[in-house]
Amino acid sequence: MKKVHERFLEYVKVDTKSDETTRVTPSTKGQLELGKILAEELKKIGVDEVRISDKGYVYACLKSNCDKDIPKIGFISHMDTAPDMSGKNVNPKIVENYDGKDIELGNGYTLSPSFSPELPMYKGQTLITTDGTTLLGADDKAGVAEIITAIEYLINHPEIKHGDIKIGFTPDEEIGEGADHFDVEGFGADFAYTLDGGRIGELEYENFNAASAKVEIIGKNVHPGSAKGKMINSILVAHEFVSMLPLNEVPEKTEGYEGFSFLLDIQGEVEKTSLSFIIRDFDKEGFKNRKERFNEIANELNKKYGEGTVTVTLKDQYMNMKEMIEPRMHIVETAEKAMKQCGIEPIKKPIRGGTDGARLSFMGLPTPNIFTGGENFHGRYEYISVNSMEKAVEVILNIIKIYAEK
């Protein structure tokens, strides 16, 4: 039987960075390649029903091995890695018996406790890091490896009784499209868990309400020598737009349950400037107010510079799954119990982001989120503890056992 970290090291070799510009699903060929690898592996270890959809989703089911009426539990992870940094030619480094000090990644980069204050808690453990040139892909190939390892353990230990266990691997989660083509009905689970969290112990059933905002500003270009009273510099209007948003409600100045507006990208010249934002808030009313503020600013600037100068396009992305999970809190409570059974103190906190589970919960599949063990996702300083990965496998198995014993 393969160890969880061995699987993980194989999966990160496949470049699965998603790309929101391609407008196809999956957005990149590497995700389909990994999906085929995973499907073949699931068949090889003895999983009963395995299929890949035309959109690259991998679905599988380990059939029940007892007559008892047990809930059908799903475990879901995503195959893509974030577009923020390259996932090509990932060259993981294994740090055995970590000494609690700086880790030289290579290529001039150092992972240090001054940057990652949590590092010393992993002293004595085996860590997997990057070489400084790519992200690692623990988000979320660690989750994929943990699920398959748990499933193989069940197959090799038929004395462990369980109901139907549903497995799902999704593409394009990192660009907000992971649930777009998920076949909830065909998946057939009563509820599920995503393995897409970070630090060991994380258990999440609240997430941001999320929207994107595209702001387009049309200016007027006139020769600068005779521009007085005529020119409208769209770049400066864009600056004005940003300055009218709450200046302290940005990612780098917020935490916990605080929301924000995040300017992701700006492209511009005098005649036309485009701004791309994301809007996040845990509170439904606060979320509504943030979106309304974008339209209010556009109206104010259009009064100042002329109708049609500023156009705002808002698009909801996902909503806070809390309202869908709370009526079924046994799902969260079971995960808590499963963690405590293997010596982990659950860390319940809101997700300052989203997971496939957020949208799936509103599609009729309540899906809280469990840790994978990774840290510093989406960049060159990403790393994961092998011990945390092994504990995630234990938690999956404990959840399955608890429901089988009820």
Curated annotation (Swiss-Prot):
HAMAP family: Aminopeptidase_M20. It catalyses: Release of the N-terminal residue from a tripeptide. It comes from Clostridium perfringens (strain SM101 / Type A). InterPro entries: ArgE/DapE_CS, Bact_exopeptidase_dim_dom, Peptidase_M20, Peptidase_M20_dimer, Peptidase_M20B. This is Peptidase T. Keywords: Aminopeptidase, Cytoplasm, Hydrolase, Metal-binding, Metalloprotease, Protease, Zinc. It is found in: Cytoplasm. PROSITE patterns: ARGE_DAPE_CPG2_1, ARGE_DAPE_CPG2_2. Its EC number is 3.4.11.4. GO terms for cellular component: cytosol. Binds 2 Zn(2+) ions per subunit. Its cofactor is Zn(2+). Zn(2+) 1 binds at H78, D139, D196. One of its GO terms (biological process) is peptide catabolic process. PANTHER family: PEPTIDASE T (PTHR42994:SF1). Belongs to the peptidase M20B family. It comes from the Bacteria. The active site is at D80, E173.
